[in-house]
Amino acid sequence: MAIYELDGQAPDLPANGNYFIADTAVVIGKVRLLNSASVWFGAVLRGDNEWIEIGEGSNVQDNSTCHTDRGFPLVIGKNCTVGHNVILHGCTLEDGALVGMGSIVMNGARIGRGSIVGAGAVITEGKEYPEHSLIIGSPAKVIRTLTPEQVTAMGSAAKFYALNGPRFKNGLKKIG
């Protein structure tokens, strides 16, 4: 794994070692991972302007990019899932949110608790979405409110990655 200090600021990782950062992920500067957070292959978390926080049990999947601008920290709440090839830039994901593959979430945007951003959606700067929303399109719009059953079911993705992190941390062996 590539973990870098920048200008005297090193990433803040759980002292108990309860996290996973894949060996091809890059974590730079003002990045804080909480317990059971995971950062997967090819993901880049570049905390050179403001803090990036990855909440407890949350995951940033393969080839996703997390970055900030001055005045726009990036906060990923508890038990969130950030799908493959997502760009998060200076935004907030409230607890239990799921961002689908290939989506873009821009500065100042806020995704409500337990919401789903559909694959390929573009969340424009400063947009805020209520909890339990299904958000799709480019530009993204709320198309409906999720049922309680759907909100409960989507938590399984975060749980899967929270369990998969230790599996990879302890069982992955490079053979070539």
Region locations from a protein language model:
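Glycine-rich hexapeptide-repeat left-handed beta-helix
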Residues: M1-N16, D48, E56, D62-S64, ...
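A positional/architectural concept
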Residues: L13-T68
